[in-house]
């Protein structure tokens, strides 16, 4: 799916950081840190992270995404790499690892997620920072963005938002993730892609098992929306503690 030219084009056209990302990056990433950017996609996070890092490496399991990044930033280091196997990197190599835009949720089973967390912990230096995001299993409604529309377009955007929210909620309830606070669904937004969903309460033991402590949790619509049922995903800033 992520080698599809249309998908690659969509990711290449995504620009800038979300306010929640900007907040966590500014707070936890220091000038001249060595940064590994996992699931780099079309390079949305590359301008910010590469500018602040002493060494920046972007990786993605889609070769087409990696090629798109090479075209955009030929001077930077981009590699085709699976997040569950970072064996090309030595232990304690990076100060910071970033896995943005819920990329970790594309790993299709719990054992794969555990390998990913373990590999990230391995390549981080002692006290290193891991910033990632994960879909909210208890999302009730995806609030539409209405700042750029007028008239009937407002109605259609609200209607579309309700339609997609209902689709996701039905799948979350059907699969048990809403009640359990974690689980897998087949996402209607991205063509039936299998995605993991979680809550801050269910993420905490998962990252703890890999040797991380959560320092801060921020909702994806921060600072304007803080209600849990209206938060599509959460960002987590974690520190390697063992």
PLM regions: where:
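A short SAM/SAH-binding and catalytic strip from SAM-dependent methyltransferases
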Residues: 96-111
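A short acidic, Gly/Pro-enriched loop at the edge of an enzyme's catalytic core
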Residues: 87-97
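Core SAM-dependent methyltransferase catalytic element
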Residues: 225-242
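Class I SAM-dependent methyltransferase SAM/SAH-binding core
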Residues: 42-85
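Conserved class I S-adenosyl-L-methionine
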Residues: 1-39, 48
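A short glycine-rich, Lys/Arg-flanked "PGG" loop and its adjoining helix->strand segment in the class I
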Residues: 114-126
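SAM-dependent methyltransferase
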Residues: 133-206
């Amino acid at each position: 799916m992520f080698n599809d030219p249309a998908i690659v084009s969509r990711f290449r056209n995504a620009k800038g950081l979300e306010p929640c990302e900007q907040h966590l990056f500014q707070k936890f990433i220091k000038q001249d840190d060595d940064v590994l950017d996992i699931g780099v996609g079309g390079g949305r996070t590359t301008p910010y992270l590469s500018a602040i890092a002493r060494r920046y490496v972007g990786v993605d399991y889609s070769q087409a995404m990696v090629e798109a990044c090479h075209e955009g930033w030929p001077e930077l280091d981009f590699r085709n790499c699976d997040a569950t196997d970072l064996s090309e990197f030595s232990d304690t190599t990076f100060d910071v690892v970033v896995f943005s835009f819920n990329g970790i949720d594309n790993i299709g089973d719990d054992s794969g997620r555990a390998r990913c967390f373990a590999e990230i912990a391995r390549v981080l230096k002692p006290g290193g920072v891991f910033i990632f995001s994960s879909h909210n299993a208890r999302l009730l409604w995806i609030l539409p963005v209405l700042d750029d529309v007028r008239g009937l377009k407002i109605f259609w955007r609200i209607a579309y938002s309700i339609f997609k929210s209902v689709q996701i909620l039905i799948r979350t309830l059907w699969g048990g993730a809403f009640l359990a606070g974690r689980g897998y669904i087949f996402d209607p937004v991205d063509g039936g892609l299998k995605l993991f969903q979680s809550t801050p309460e269910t993420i905490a033991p998962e990252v703890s098992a890999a040797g991380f402590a959560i320092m801060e949790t921020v909702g994806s619509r921060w600072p304007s929306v803080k209600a849990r049922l209206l938060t599509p995903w959460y960002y987590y800033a974690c520190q390697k503690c063992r």
